[in-house]
Regions:
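SAM-dependent transferase fold signal centered on methyltransferase-like domains
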Residues: 1-190
Length: 190
């Protein structure tokens, strides 16, 4: 996706579809969704046209990164990854925190190819979480089975939650400690 025309690739064995559009416009987002369906990776190298005013350039880069993040939320299935370029600055922590809430982990990567004075970095978010629970949630669950390690197993909308120190047949209130793309861990609340 680019606002400018993208030259087609010469290799017919590599199917690449290009979209000329502006990621901040709904019609472009719809074109992406229609073309891709579900993805394993969303990679955004977008950057604003720089003005030389650091705070403005940073804010505009965060806005573009958020647009890519929103597209990723629509396109990525469980376990999918996001890589997004952004300029370092005061709004980076808020953006990173928002992304962390949707992925197993997020890292800042500063490419070696960037100039030493560059504020450019990439947020690399791994393993999209689509679970119906999040870390810190307190919920009541029914223990429906026992796992190989002896933990109780609860099912929430098809999602497996391992609960320590309980047995099948119990109904307990738990606090979710850790969430992975396909399963999570919780402890009973006394």
């Amino acid at each position: 996706v680019d606002r400018q025309r993208i030259d087609s690739l010469d290799d017919p064995d590599v199917p690449v579809e290009t979209i000329r559009g502006d990621i901040t416009e709904e019609s472009t987002v719809e074109a992406i969704t229609d073309a891709v369906g579900e993805a394993n990776l969303v990679l955004s190298d977008m950057a604003p046209n720089v003005t030389g005013e650091y705070d403005l350039d940073h804010a505009r880069s965060v806005h573009l990164a958020r647009q890519a993040f929103e597209v990723a939320l629509d396109l990525l299935g469980a376990g999918g990854d996001l890589v997004v370029k952004v300029f370092d600055g005061r709004d980076l922590d808020d953006l990173k925190s928002d992304i962390e809430g949707e992925f197993e982990y997020v890292r800042e990567v500063r490419p070696d190819a960037s100039r030493d004075s560059s504020s450019e970095l990439y947020l690399v978010a791994k393993h999209r979480l689509t679970a119906p629970v999040r870390e810190g949630d307190e919920i009541e669950v029914e223990i429906v089975d026992t796992g190989e390690e002896g933990d109780g197993i609860a099912k929430i909308e098809g999602f497996t939650l391992f609960v320590s120190g309980v047995e099948a047949g119990e109904t307990v209130t738990v606090r979710v400690d850790d969430v992975k793309p396909q399963y999570g861990f919780a402890e009973p609340i006394e």
